[in-house]
Amino acid sequence: MSREAFDVPNIGTNKFLKVTPNLFTPERLNLFDDVELYLTLIKASKCVEQGERLHNISWRILNKAVLKEHNINRSKKRDGVKNIYYVLNPNNKQPIKPKQAAVKQPPLQKANLPPTTAKQNVLTRPMTSPAIAQGAHDRSLDNPNSTNNDVKNDVAPNRQFSKSTTSGLFSNFADKYQKMKNVNHVANKEEPQTIITGFDTSTVITKKPLQSRRSRSPFQHIGDMNMNCIDNETSKSTSPTLENMGSRKSSFPQKESLFGRPRSYKNDQNGQLSLSKTSSRKGKNKIFFSSEDEDSDWDSVSNDSEFYADEDDEEYDDYNEEEADQYYRRQWDKLLFAKNQQNLDSTKSSVSSANTINSNTSHDPVRKSLLSGLFLSEANSNSNNHNTAHSEYASKHVSPTPQSSHSNIGPQPQQNPPSANGIKQQKPSLKTSNVTALASLSPPQPSNNERLSMDIQKDFKTDNESNHLYESNAPLTAQTILPTALSTHMFLPNNIHQQRMAIATGSNTRHRFSRRQSMDIPSKNRNTGFLKTRMEISEEEKMVRTISRLDNTSIANSNGNGNDDTSNQRTEALGRKTSNGGRI
């Protein structure tokens, strides 16, 4: 740092040096790009005010240039001016120059304008209705207070700006800062194009007439034509339904929708009811709101609501709903009556019950519903099932009688009177002939059961018998649930099933050979507890063959010597088996 950069009023041991503000003038700002300035601050840190902070800041700026930018000669003006200025002038308590105060006065004068001059540029439109004019006169008494409050709120931030003081070493930075501050914080409010000074809540907001304003909305030109067409269609559609209900109800209450036009029910000269629409648009106060563009197609209150409301009212009218409810109620009563009539007539005869239901349904001249005939079909199916079941039951319980090959011999079969259920039963009578034989009531029919072998039939019989062999100590619920589960979704293991079959039939199980087991195929019999080698398995198979052969020979030989020989051979084979087990 050069000598002129320091202000040395008194040189002494108890005095400290101070960095002069002239360092921040535009002529000397280029010194912040030089490394010599920062090195001088580092060396003179012990005898300069805020020397430690200047020392640290200087080192930080140099290290940033070397390590981050990899160039110590890079421009360090921004970091140096910003950091060193805030160290030397931390509080900003210097007074503002007169030039800066003069710069700040124009926005304050602009903000202090009276509210009347600020409101002169706003376009206002008077109200034509006397009720709205009266509401405007009543509300105008409260407006001065509200407008004064708004002006005070707008001027308050500007006064705060005037009270805040900033100190700078050069005026151009402070002027630019203050101008930017005023631009950022002064809110330019956009006033609406149309202001209504008073508004009465009791007035009805409607659309402005078509001839009084200019618009390009397609609904305005076509709306009246559509309304006339809709009136004609509704008068045609509702006339037949009203004729049906004219004898029951003479008058209907007048209903009015929220947006649609009210309508009243009137009697014509012929005594028929008809719908008539009454227009209630006359005598209402009208307020027209437009957007910022006078030629815009959109209005805040549109006539489309009336157009669609009329359609909704005509489509979903209460009268039509009542008629539909009564129609479906009559249909439901007919179905219930048909079901009850079917139950009553079934005691007499099935044919007569079907005829009565057909006659009851044929008398109705009104259109049929989708549910018509539901109970009729169910009743017919139930009666047919009942007839077939009863005939099968009667045929099973009739005692078998002898039949003859000659049908013309003997008395004719007698017919019994009809039973309580209206079904005629025919019992076969005795027929006398030369040749008599007992036969089944139904002729034999070829079936697939003949193809089954006798072995399969025997197995089926043993399976049915084995189901009732077990005895359980379980409670009654388990005794009833377990057989059902076994017959539906539970299956017994094969070995247990085979054991029960063997016990039931008493067959010899010694001739049954188990599957070959080895080291590769683990044994399913877990009673042994160890695995066998192939040699042991082959020896056991040989032993089983010899035992079976000896048993067969023992049956053939009935003398005592033969029995002794076979017993000796069997003991020798068993001795070899036990010796092999002892080795393992």
From Swiss-Prot:
Gene giving rise to this polypeptide: MKS1
Composition-biased stretches (Low complexity): 381-392, 557-568
Ranges of Acidic residues composition bias in the record: 307-320
Gene Ontology BP, a term: negative regulation of transcription by RNA polymerase II
One Pfam family in the UniProt entry: GATA_AreA
Taxonomic path: Eukaryota, Fungi, Dikarya, Ascomycota, Saccharomycotina
Function: Negative regulator of Ras-cAMP pathway. Involved in transcriptional regulation of galactose-inducible genes.
A Gene Ontology term for the protein's cellular component: cytoplasm
Sites of Phosphoserine modification: 247, 276, 442, 518
Region described as Disordered: spans on this chain: 95-167, 209-279, 291-320, 343-366, 381-432, 551-584
Biased composition (Polar residues): 114-127, 229-254, 267-278, 343-363, 398-432
Keyword Protein biosynthesis belongs to the record: no
Protein name, entry field: Negative regulator of RAS-cAMP pathway
Entry's localization field: Nucleus
Residues bearing PTM Phosphothreonine: 25
